[in-house]
Amino acid sequence: MYKTFFKLVFSRMDPERAHHLAFRWIRLAVRVPVLRTFVAAALAPRHKELRTEALGLRMHGPFGLAAGFDKNAVAIDGMAMLGFDHVEIGTVTGEPQPGNPKKRLFRLVADRALINRMGFNNDGSLAVAARLASRTPVFRTVVGVNIGKTKVVPEEEAVGDYVKSAERLAPHADYLVVNVSSPNTPGLRNLQATEALRPLLSAVREAADRAVTARRVPLLVKIAPDLADEDVDAVADLAVELGLDGIIATNTTIAREGLGLTSSPALVGETGGLSGAPLKARSLEVLRRLYARVGDRITLVGVGGVETAEDAWERILAGATLVQGYSAFIYEGPFWGRAMHKGLAARLRQSPYATLADAVGADVRKHS
């Protein structure tokens, strides 16, 4: 039903306008008690065998919404209603910013992919922190907060910008993510180099600890799929050394070659980060490499090209304790979360593993 609707309606609309329209519907639905209860019962079924513990947090399952969909923390309950076990908001920057000029979001329907050059459009850390502080949760879900650099802040002043966001947002976050991997903010990916990343992560960790003294807010870093293998290893080693809680692998890619893209050259040639199905192989490769390097010492989150329960299961076997998606949600619609949960539960029952935790990294351990 949704695929027909997408073909007849959403596919004919500007992608960003369609996003805002869908967003509005989700937010409206969650405001009606009877409707949200019915929708959650239908689309967010709970499977006991999928219960997950990660980052010191308990979740209904391992499957969550990647950052980028809810940039301003306005639809957390709506996304939980649709079956996401954790919702990562953002990317949020120190100061509010409009992002890059439109048109900045493109669908590659033939490739089940998106290209975006949104540029961290968001309300800024002060406004988002206030929104989170005033929120009365309807559904119990884990909320991650993804922070990035304000565009106008020079690279040499980036640490202070991230620290400002961390101090404001850490009190309202179940976990924090340092995003240094978006291709749409000039110079941002330079911060993935360990000599720049070390002081940044250390400063954000200290800022979060200053802002929240009653608990330790887990801190993760999100990396790009375009890192060379030796740089992936370097980030993994640094994460362990600094006592980071996790790594999210991966963000969007700037690559176009070797991905088997069949969409029109004009679309494929659009500047920005590519997400969705074509990213699957490289994101999985990075995840496997990370798990081989860090094992169970830190939590790994697999994202990039996750479309089906089988994809999610593959990420778990490759070392992911948590799995995220976003692009496939655009193509699969509101029933996607339900299908992911049902498929994952079935896959676990068919496997030799008693729990999801037993399955994490099993393929990598088998070949090491």
Curated annotation (Swiss-Prot):
The active site is formed by 182 (nucleophile)
Any one Pfam family here would be: DHO_dh
Query: What's its catalytic activity?
Result: (S)-dihydroorotate + a quinone = orotate + a quinol
A GO molecular-function term, please? dihydroorotate dehydrogenase activity
Q: Which cofactor does it need?
A: FMN
* Binding-site residues, FMN: 67-71, 91, 146, 179, 222, 250, 276, 305, 326-327
Task: Output the GO biological process annotations, alphabetical, semicolon-separated.
Answer: 'de novo' pyrimidine nucleobase biosynthetic process; 'de novo' UMP biosynthetic process; pyrimidine ribonucleotide biosynthetic process
The annotated pathway is: Pyrimidine metabolism; UMP biosynthesis via de novo pathway; orotate from (S)-dihydroorotate (quinone route): step 1/1
UniProt keywords (A-Z) are: Cell membrane, Flavoprotein, FMN, Membrane, Oxidoreductase, Pyrimidine biosynthesis
- Keyword Cell membrane among UniProt keywords: yes
Do you know which Gene3D superfamilies this protein is assigned to? Aldolase class I (3.20.20.70)
This enzyme's EC code(s): 1.3.5.2
Subunit field text: Monomer.
Please give the name of this protein: Dihydroorotate dehydrogenase (quinone)
Q: What is the lineage of its organism?
A: Bacteria, Bacillati, Actinomycetota, Actinomycetes, Kitasatosporales
User: Gene name, please?
Assistant: pyrD
